[in-house]
């Protein structure tokens, strides 16, 4: 597998032999990675960094529909299967099974994101933001731990915030046969994924921060700017 092949295949793995890995890291050295859980403030931090420091932002969530349209069910099996589930189907499974399925989904989505990055011309620093940034995969793509950061919302904060995120949450739950059970399994799944992200980032020596709502978003963005090495500006 060559680097040119990686660039040509949206779902191609960015992890291969040593020569390919080195070339991929070189081509992505301008990329910063901001991952983490739902309700952790990733998108707001990215927006503030873009405004204060001029960094371009790639939102994995915003790319989802485009990737969904380009996905090959024979190649991106988990991405297509999980992405096509209705809420009632998604949350009907036990939380542990949901978490396992979602990690496979995120892994395939991340490879599609990497495909986009490899096809893009390198330039000014680019901040990639999204829940699909799995620590072990990102670790293979960076030259320095300072290129990556994960924000993980605490259980209590995430559950409180989800209930205030707007009518779309209630609408999704209303489509389920057992709305209360669906919400509980949804939150339990996210608890499992949060613990997993923390353990993985810690194991790999990568930075993760707990978000409980006690820090103003401006302060969180300023701390993220310092982590990534931005100077000056006001977040």
Describe these PLM feature segments.
Residues 53-71:
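Short beta-strand-centered segment that lines the nucleotide-binding/catalytic pocket of NTP-utilizing
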Residues 43:
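Walker A/P-loop
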Residues 34:
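Hydrophobic anchor at the beta1->P-loop junction of P-loop NTPases
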Residues 37-40:
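ATP-binding Walker
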Residues 146-193:
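A glycine- and Lys/Arg-enriched "phosphate-lid" helix/loop adjacent to the NTP-binding pocket
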Residues 3-4, 9-13, 18, 192-235:
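NTP-dependent small-molecule kinase module
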Residues 66-125, 132:
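ATP-dependent small-molecule kinase phosphotransfer cores
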Residues 21-29:
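Phosphate-binding P-loop
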């Amino acid at each position: 597998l060559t680097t040119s092949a990686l660039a040509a295949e949206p779902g191609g793995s960015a992890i291969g032999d040593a020569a390919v890995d080195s070339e991929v890291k070189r081509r992505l050295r301008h990329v910063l990675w901001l991952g983490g859980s739902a309700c952790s403030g990733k998108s707001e931090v990215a927006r503030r960094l873009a405004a204060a420091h001029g960094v371009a932002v790639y939102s994995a969530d915003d790319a989802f529909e485009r990737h969904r349209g380009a996905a090959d069910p024979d190649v991106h099996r988990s991405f297509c299967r999980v992405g096509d589930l209705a809420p009632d189907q998604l949350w009907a499974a036990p939380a542990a099974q949901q978490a396992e399925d979602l990690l496979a989904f995120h892994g395939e989505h991340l490879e599609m994101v990497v495909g986009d990055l490899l096809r893009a011309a390198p330039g000014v620093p680019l901040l990639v933001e999204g829940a699909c940034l799995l620590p072990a995969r990102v670790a293979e793509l960076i030259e320095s731990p300072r290129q990556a950061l994960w924000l993980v919302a605490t259980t209590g904060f995430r559950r409180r915030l989800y209930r205030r995120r707007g009518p779309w949450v209630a609408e999704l739950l209303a489509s389920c046969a057992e709305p209360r059970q669906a919400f509980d399994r949804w939150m339990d799944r996210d608890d499992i994924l949060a613990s997993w992200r923390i353990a993985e980032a810690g194991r790999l020596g990568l930075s993760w921060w707990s978000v409980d709502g006690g820090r103003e978003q401006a302060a969180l963005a300023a701390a993220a700017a310092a982590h990534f090495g931005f100077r000056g500006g006001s977040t």
